[in-house]
From Swiss-Prot:
GO (cellular component) term, any one: nuclear speck
Basic residues biased stretches: 233-247, 491-512, 545-555
Secretion signal, residue range per the UniProt entry: none
Keywords for the protein's UniProt record, in alphabetical order: Acetylation, Chromosome, DNA-binding, Isopeptide bond, Nucleus, Phosphoprotein, Repeat, Ubl conjugation
Species for this entry: Bos taurus
Biased composition (Acidic residues): 430-452
Protein name: Heterochromatin protein 1-binding protein 3
Main location: nucleus
Length: 555
């Protein structure tokens, strides 16, 4: 049969479907017999079933057979067989497909596990870095306890190697200095955690470092052998040289300042926008401005805040009235708020208590170059980059955006500087101005007290009638001034009673001034006694003229 089917040219096209159909029927009969016995033969039958349609398709691509009754029957039988066989083939095909899927899953699992292990290792490395609490952080006792639990302080059970070396040299000092052998024994005995027996290079490095600094001096030997002495006078000459340098050119106090200490203040000044709640403002003002007595009189602070909002110096973001959050407004770089002591206190409180404190690296670079330029600007930028990285590792700062030396950083601990630290130039000027104002007020009051009486005296001549309050005040001053004038004029008034007895013609004239002298001190004005004195001064002249007339009459 195979030879007949293979020679397609000899077979008539109409006879081809009949031959194929006969083959299929014969195969079906064989399959029915074998189905009851074993399954493996069925697989072979399936393979034979599948081959004829392939050959049929290969041979009959060009020639399309005409449909006959026999062909229709054969097609129907093929369809029935195909409908019966799929469950077995589907299960068979699923088995080999399922195996590679399982293999792929098994391969993916180890890759995922390796990724997880890498992540865990990176997290462990991050956890291993001990986060410390910075010296500039302003924390209460409860906040400090919480922070210590969350970020345990890096305990330092022993000092640094340089300090240990100087301590050992002083302890082992003799006439010829301290030998390296004695120094080593001392350190091994007192600081066993260093393991100096195994790590002898630590001692050599420390000796070399301290020799270069000039802290110690080598008396005997060379290198890491011999005897050493601590130089005590090395600290005084540099101070003198510094003083001389400062006298000649006072420029180099900056190297002593660390960028780690500068950054928190830079963050507080550069952070924008600055805003704080009423409770924080009140807390800060009551702490640093006790003269305002905000705890006793909170209404003063509330009124000042409301007044600043009405003027446009502050913006109330949340809340109503004096409660809520207030934000500073600026014209350029200068804040609009300022002037009185209360306004200055509110300004410093909002600037200091603003949280969270964030700042961009560009603003930090500009601030450092303007305020702490150093000798080399490029080196200063390098130091700034290193300090930011170190602060981030210690957990003092956090990079919110960007990577490396770009983006924005944020302080992880609260920092509330005092007004003197926040505005060092403004506060002393304000205090001086306040003192000057007080002095001016006192001096003006004293001058007014001294200058007030003369115009009153002039008015007294013009207007004898005065209020009872002024009269009482003038009585006291009149009592002080009255005894002084007669004391100076007593020498001139005394000769009057001596020359009075020979006078006979002028009793009426002399009787007139006596009541005026008695009445004038009892009067309300202080000028009247002075006027009476003037009249008394003129009286001797009149007395002399009368005396001359009396002498002439006697002659």
């Amino acid at each position: 049969m195979a030879t007949d089917t293979s020679q397609g040219e000899l077979v008539h096209p109409k006879a081809l479907p009949l031959i194929v159909g006969a083959q299929l029927i014969h195969a079906d009969k064989l399959g029915e017999k074998v189905e009851d016995n074993t399954m493996p033969i069925r697989r072979a039958v399936n393979s034979t079933r599948e081959t004829p349609p392939k050959s049929k398709l290969a041979e009959g691509v060009e020639e399309k057979p005409e449909p006959d009754v026999s062909s229709e029957e054969s097609i129907s039988t093929v369809e029935e067989q195909e409908n019966e066989t799929p469950p077995a083939t589907s299960s068979e095909t699923e088995q080999p497909k399922g195996q590679p899927e399982n293999e792929e899953k098994e391969e993916n699992k180890p890759s995922e596990e390796t990724k997880k292990d890498e992540k865990d290792q990176s997290k462990e490395k991050e956890k291993k870095v001990k986060k410390t609490i910075p010296s500039w952080a302003t924390l209460s006792a409860s906040q400090l306890a919480r922070a210590q639990k969350q970020t345990p302080m890096a305990s330092s059970p022993r000092p640094k190697m340089d300090a240990i070396l100087t301590e050992a040299i002083k302890a082992c000092f003799q006439k010829s200095g301290a030998s390296v052998v004695a120094i080593r024994k001392y350190i091994i005995h007192k600081y066993p955690s260093l393991e100096l027996e195994r790590r002898g290079y630590l001692l050599k490095q420390a000796l070399k470092r301290e020799l270069n600094r000039g802290v110690i001096k080598q008396v005997k030997g060379k290198g890491a052998s011999g005897s050493f002495v601590v130089v005590q006078k090395s600290r005084k000459p540099p101070q003198k040289s510094r003083n001389r340098k400062n006298r000649s050119s006072a420029v180099d106090p900056e190297p002593q300042v660390k960028l780690e200490d500068i950054l928190p203040l830079a963050f507080t000044r550069l952070c924008e926008p600055k805003e704080a709640s009423y409770s924080l403002i009140r807390k800060y003002v009551s702490q640093y401005y006790p003269k305002l007595r905000v705890d006793i009189r909170p209404q003063l602070l509330k009124n000042a805040l409301q007044r600043a909002v009405e003027r446009g110096q502050l913006e109330q973001i949340t809340g109503k009235g004096a409660s809520g959050t207030f934000q500073l407004k600026k014209s350029g770089e200068k804040p609009l708020l300022g002037g009185s002591l209360m306004e200055y206190a509110i300004l410093s409180a909002i600037a200091a208590m603003n949280e969270p404190k964030t700042c961009s690296t560009t603003a930090l670079k500009k601030y450092v170059l303007e305020n702490h330029p150093g000798t080399n600007s490029n080196y200063q930028m390098h130091l700034l980059k290193k300090t930011l990285q170190r602060c981030e590792k210690n957990g003092w700062m956090e990079q919110i955006s960007g990577k490396g030396f770009s983006g924005t950083f944020q302080l992880c601990f609260p920092y509330y500087p005092s007004p003197g630290v926040l505005f060092p130039k403004k506060e002393p000027d304000d205090s001086k101005d306040e003192d000057e104002d007080e002095d001016e007020d006192d001096s003006s009051e004293e001058d007014s007290e001294d200058e007030e009486p003369p115009p009153k005296r002039r008015l007294q001549k013009k207007t004898p009638v005065k209020s009872p309050g002024k009269a009482a005040a003038m009585k006291q001053r009149g009592s002080k001034l009255a005894p002084k004038v007669p004391a100076a004029q007593r020498g001139k008034t005394r000769p009057l009673p001596k020359k009075a007895p020979p006078k006979a013609k002028s009793p009426a004239k002399k009787a007139r001034p006596s009541p005026s002298v008695i009445k004038k001190p009892s009067g309300s004005s202080s000028k009247k006694p002075a006027a009476s004195v003037r009249k008394e001064v003129k009286l001797p002249g009149k007395g002399k003229s009368t005396m001359k007339k009396s002498f002439k009459a006697k002659k």
